[in-house]
Swiss-Prot record:
<protein>
    <recommendedName>
        <fullName>Valine--tRNA ligase</fullName>
        <ecNumber>6.1.1.9</ecNumber>
    </recommendedName>
</protein>
<feature type="short sequence motif" description="'HIGH' region">
    <location>
        <begin position="48"/>
        <end position="58"/>
    </location>
</feature>
<feature type="coiled-coil region">
    <location>
        <begin position="883"/>
        <end position="953"/>
    </location>
</feature>
<dbReference type="InterPro" id="IPR009080">
    <property type="entry name" value="tRNAsynth_Ia_anticodon-bd"/>
</dbReference>
<keyword id="KW-0175">Coiled coil</keyword>
<keyword id="KW-0547">Nucleotide-binding</keyword>
<dbReference type="InterPro" id="IPR013155">
    <property type="entry name" value="M/V/L/I-tRNA-synth_anticd-bd"/>
</dbReference>
<comment type="subunit">
    <text>Monomer.</text>
</comment>
<dbReference type="InterPro" id="IPR002300">
    <property type="entry name" value="aa-tRNA-synth_Ia"/>
</dbReference>
<keyword id="KW-0963">Cytoplasm</keyword>
<dbReference type="Pfam" id="PF10458">
    <property type="entry name" value="Val_tRNA-synt_C"/>
</dbReference>
<keyword id="KW-0648">Protein biosynthesis</keyword>
<feature type="short sequence motif" description="'KMSKS' region">
    <location>
        <begin position="560"/>
        <end position="564"/>
    </location>
</feature>
<dbReference type="GO" id="GO:0004832">
    <property type="term" value="F:valine-tRNA ligase activity"/>
</dbReference>
<dbReference type="GO" id="GO:0005829">
    <property type="term" value="C:cytosol"/>
</dbReference>
<dbReference type="InterPro" id="IPR014729">
    <property type="entry name" value="Rossmann-like_a/b/a_fold"/>
</dbReference>
<dbReference type="InterPro" id="IPR019499">
    <property type="entry name" value="Val-tRNA_synth_tRNA-bd"/>
</dbReference>
Amino acid sequence: MTQKFEMADRFNPSAVEQALYQHWEESGYFKPSENENAPSYCIAIPPPNVTGSLHMGHAFQQTLMDTLIRFNRMEGHNTLWQAGTDHAGIATQMVVERKIAAEEGKTRHDYGREAFINKIWDWKAYSGGTISQQMRRLGNSIDWERERFTMDDGLSNAVKEVFVRLHEEGLIYRGKRLVNWDPKLHTAISDLEVENKESKGSLWHFRYPLANGAKTADGKDYLVVATTRPETMLGDTAVAVHPEDERYQSLIGKTVVLPLANREIPIIADEYVDREFGTGVVKITPAHDFNDYEVGKRHNLPMVNVLTLNANIRDEAEIIGTDGKPLAGYEATIPADYRGLERFAARKKIVADFEALGLLDEIKPHDLKVPYGDRGGVPIEPMLTDQWYVSVKPLADVAIKAVEDGEIQFVPKQYENLYFSWMRDIQDWCISRQLWWGHRIPAWYDAEGNVYVARNEEEVRSKYNLDSAVELKQDEDVLDTWFSSGLWTFSTLGWPEQTKELKMFHPTDVLITGFDIIFFWVARMIMFTMHFVKDENGKPQVPFKTVYVTGLIRDEQGQKMSKSKGNVLDPIDMIDGISLEDLLEKRTGNMMQPQLAEKIAKATRKEFADGIAAHGTDALRFTLAALASNGRDINWDMKRLEGYRNFCNKLWNASRFVLTNEKLDLSEGEIEFSLADRWIQSEFNRTVETFRNSLSQYRFDLCANAIYEFTWNQFCDWYLELTKPVFANGNAAQIRAASQTLVHVLEKLLRLAHPLIPFITEEIWQKVKGFVGITADSIMLQPFPQVEENGFDLEAEAEIEWLKEVIVAVRNIRAESNIAPSKGLDLLFRNLSAENAKILEKQTALLKAMAKLDNVQVLAANEAAPLAVAKLVGNAELLVPMAGFINKEAELARLTKEIEKYQNEVKRIENKLSNESFVAKAPEAVIAKEREKQAEYQSGLEKIQEQYKAIEAL
């Protein structure tokens, strides 16, 4: 009848995953086909930090990307997943600085720039492959031969090209403006690297004496100025009030004497001032506050910088005009007592001196957010420094229009509003960083400080006609990491060369990323790409057609995962498993705070008492896809992961059941498809339709759900059972039909599920392919199932649906009445429609086999029925006679005890939830859990009461 076939009892992911991946990679299956007649499909991966390691966010986004890549490859598209890593300037430099400090007791300055950069390249060579290897473990079908690094020669050339061209167009300039300054790391940092920490501070109320005998409306000769930053008051160049604040309108245009510094500064009116904050009078320090900087520009105020790059008080103030150039003629001497003081020491002294002069009005407690550098760990300072800037407004206008016109779609659409709000209020972008690791700015200076911009020094001399005797020194700064990653989609494809890859794969199709970098990365990619990449008609190209924005992966309590919270989960641990001891070491091993380490250890022991079991890559991927509801943050759920590992096992066991069935007959000959055969093929066709529609809308959760629902609830729970009577009692034609249907539906199901769960589907498919006459090497290159327009069998679907309802009703009667599954029952129908009577007539044998029935009878309209338990299916009444099956009194006594037990539980929880003290103190999650239990007990109680009534009526 069929070949003898053996298959392991269980699927063992660790035994097959890495070998399968190696085979795929070595066979070149991840490479584009480069078939110019096929549509191209390309995704550029958001480049992770080269020295980093994979976290759950990476695993989540990359699973979604690989699903799309595998799907499009199976669709026959010329598919490229462009991978690579980011040099991650400040992060990588700090890792290596800490390393040499710990191991050698040295700083980067001990090495010097060139030697230190070589040290970083060594570190990159040593650790840079970690994340690539971890990405392989996820099953990512990446063309690794095309892997790029943001400081590769090719990408470095692209960076220089963009810088030089923008400079030539007047869109890059050097100027002195206010930036986020990290006084520990001595570099400007981006807003993304600033962490605003809640802090309990103070609001100091200082008296600033009015000059020239002026008085307030209530006769005072001073204004009370509220500030959270006394240490910068030596740099005040005005005090401001709201123009409509009647308390101070008469003083606008007059002056106050700045205490301690003894210089007069004007009283100005500006709508920036909040009349309700403090006294409604604020000091304006344009050199040390971003809001004040804007006020200063509006009122043409001088900028007085009183801090050094270490955030100490300067010996001499630096006076700058609103044009960023030194300003002559403005006196702002720093009193000798404060020179050289560290900023917070200066704060204490200034407050004490105000008090000594009788000018400290009051101090109020004040909650505020203090900006910290996320790498340096100290409060950042708004600082006037010389930096390079991109004038981005002209680039932003084009980038806004691309989204407005629908050339780029955001999914979910609401993120367009976030994009527009940022882009329409865009400021010039500070692109220089005071670091050593990164793309060094292609600008050179001569002895007089003249600036020359070109791709290299040789070009500088040629472009500006400089003699070899002119000594040139390259700018020490490097570019913001976001500058090079902004070129990612086109620089990785060979730009500025017009390569065949650029022509074939650009624009890319979709970008999958987090909402937090829409401005820092997504917007800049759109701006740069549209400025530099044009199609054959000269029209600006977008970098991607769709931006799919994911939420964050949080822990089970909804907390953001972070090392300091000790709740980080490593995706590799989900795949391979990890012991409790190793997990504790991972979470607390390098912690300097013993109390925090103990708190984390306690929580970890409670949550993972036995460590984390191995689940395999497919279970992890399926879970991530199933949780991917559009744009929402996701609370990780270990139970879902276990459930989807069980799902993978279910798929394996079902395949084993099919392929090891000794009665399977795939020989040539007459075939007679049963109702069940027609139904499962129609259901599969519908599942393909659901999957394709869902994927086109980036609803990965619905894709996973469609596969789960079909595999578990239709194929395994029903169809496999429906074939058993055929193999037991069917004729040869029916057995051949069931055999063909089983193996063909299974093979197509594996292809359908492959983009989500690549390893188990490949492993099973290698065993199935011989049964369906396929000789190809890999499921990866097989066509993805199509929706067959004529493949929907509505009649079969309706008939099986009715039969399933009847079978479930009979099984429920058995369970509720404690009748063993092995005992045959009689089934009576009353009020059966003509349509359902026809189904019953054709499928009586199937119904008897599936519901374990001895007799099936349709009662006439007025025919009396024996004492029976009844269920409704639609309008039809199903009756199962109970004579001889149960001891009525004993069963009622047992159910009475059950009812009492459930009633007591419901009452206990009701009392708990009506206790105001409990509800006020208990966490929301605990209350929700109690309500869940209450609903479960209430539902159980109602079911038992129904059973009681049914048996009482016998």
